[in-house]
Amino acid sequence: MRQMIPDNSFIHQKTTIMKKYMFFCALLTALNSFAKTGDTFSDGGVTYQVIATSEGGGEVAVHSLDPSASLTDALIPSAVSDGGVLYDVTSVSPEAFKGSALRTVVLPEGVTAIERAAFQNCSLLTEVTLPSSLTSIGDFAFAGCASLTSIPLPQDVAYIGRQAFAGCASITHVAIPDGIETIGEDAFLNCSALISVSLPDNMAGVGEGMFEMCGQLEDISLPEGVQYIDSHAFSGCGALASITLPETLAGVGESAFAGCKELASVTVPQNVTGLPDGAFAYCSRLKSVTLPNSVTAIGSGVFRYDQALTHVTLPSWLETIGTGDLGGVFERCDAMTELTIPASVRKIGKMDSFPFGLNSIYVMGDVIPDGLQEMGSRNRMGEDITIYVKRSVYNEKYSSGEWNGFRVDYRIPIKMVNAKGNAVKYKTLCRDFDVDLRHSGDDLSDGTKRLSAYVVDDADGELGMVFMDEILYIPSRLMANVDGYAGEDRYVGVVVRGTPGSTYYYEIGENDYSQGAEGQWLLADAQAVSMTAHAGSNMMRGISDSAYILPAEVDSETGVAVTNYGLNNNAFRKLSGPGWMGYNRSYLPLPEKMAGTNFSMTFTDVDGTTDTIGYEAFINDCDGDDFYDLSGRRTAPTAKGVIVRKGRKVLK
């Protein structure tokens, strides 16, 4: 019988195949235990998505709420595990919690990004805790979270996306972090409860629509270094009563401050070269606007419907006015009664809609701009407006007294009455163009004294006296011909004296070039013509636009602490408190050490005649002083005629 011997090679081959199969199954099982990028899993009521894998771990993003859970308070851990693998939580996915019923959220350290619309329209969300590791907040991330009361932003946040917090109607304060680099447009649009904002020192600008329609915003300080304010940045911030624009500011966007109803005044810094369409439109309480000489273009509708605005001094280098499509620059600024157009203006755009109260336009150039023609020929107000030009321009081109429906004249009236219509002998004056008084005495009726204007040469607090020199030609725009100067111009304030109730006429000075032409006179030039003794000096401060004046302050030109005086009842009296002073007026700042209750006025005319108003106050203050007549003989302070006290001639 034949004995069978087992085939060991076959057994070995079978065993090898089985081992390979078992190894493959084990390998497949091991591979399946590691999730792939994009896989999701749930933990603690929250779904996570794998965004990166590595040996023994990976990263996940918070993806959404687990539909099977009813989570209202989310405490996100810094790491989660799935299948024995630990994943770091590093971001929140787009629309992760959009429209959910979450009330509170705590995000862990390690999260660096909140993606687009992650918490959008979570209307019940009241509190969010963000980690210090956060650097990016995406578009619409918290938009429409109407119950969210605060949002403390970590200092390393560099990016805030478009409309990231738009419609967060309960947030009251926002502090932009130091690490910010980019803020998308409309970032805080319609945060209707927002009251205050803190901006970092390194912030370069305020983006488009950043705080648009933040109707309760009343406190924001722009740091030095801000270079631009983009379009609609503060549009609709109805509670914003004041804002200081930094000297570093170089650009303002369209409608940047439109609808800031409480904004009372604004000073544009000297790096700004133009104001675009609607920049300050619908600012219904705006009273004062100061523009630097650097502004060469003003867009259309810049001040439209600013119904408290009484006057704007246009800068000396201005070239274009209202060349856009929004109508007249001053449309429905119905408190405005006059406008001065500098000689530098080369182009005026659409001017068919002007303030209803406008009655005077002063043209400094050699020709009336064509841009005014449409208003004169089509607007019913044309016949009620007088255009004033220089005497030489009138005689050469407009001697008929009419141009395209306007009256044209060179004689500008001034009536000696106060704001209440009461006849007065003294008024203060400041104009944004040169004033020539050398013909103001022509054709006066019997008993009417000529109109005289005076600068304040000196003041003596011990005597209670203000010493005034007559000036026949009052220059304006004193900085217009200073090379390289682009700041706000300076204007000459004077006191005028005439017969109470009388109407006088002055003219635009022929030397007003408005743009630094060689003929533009300085104060010393004008005083030389007037032959006054103290050329170049004037203590008066002229106001060509309405201004808010404090009773005491540090003088911006001299750096000296001063007390401010206004003319009232024939004497300079201390201002009783802060308040608005109307345009075309002036006031007297005196050093605190010179401050007295009231000051009498001593006038020196061009012919050398001197007289004093408030003489009894002058005498009472002079006990113990020596007085002399013009021959040098000592005399009594009550002597008639001209007497001399401390080198000053006084007429009694």
Map each language-model feature to its residues.
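Terminal processing/anchoring signals of secreted or surface-associated proteins
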Residues: 18, 35, 76, 494, ...
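Structural signature of tandem-repeat unit edges
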Residues: 69-91, 100-113, 123-136, 146-159, ...
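Positively charged n-region of N-terminal signal peptides that target proteins for export
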Residues: 2-3, 12-21, 652
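A short, polar beta-strand/turn micro-motif
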Residues: 396, 400-446, 476-612
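Consensus positions within tandem repeat domains that build extended binding/scaffold surfaces
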Residues: 94-95, 115-118, 138-141, 161-164, ...
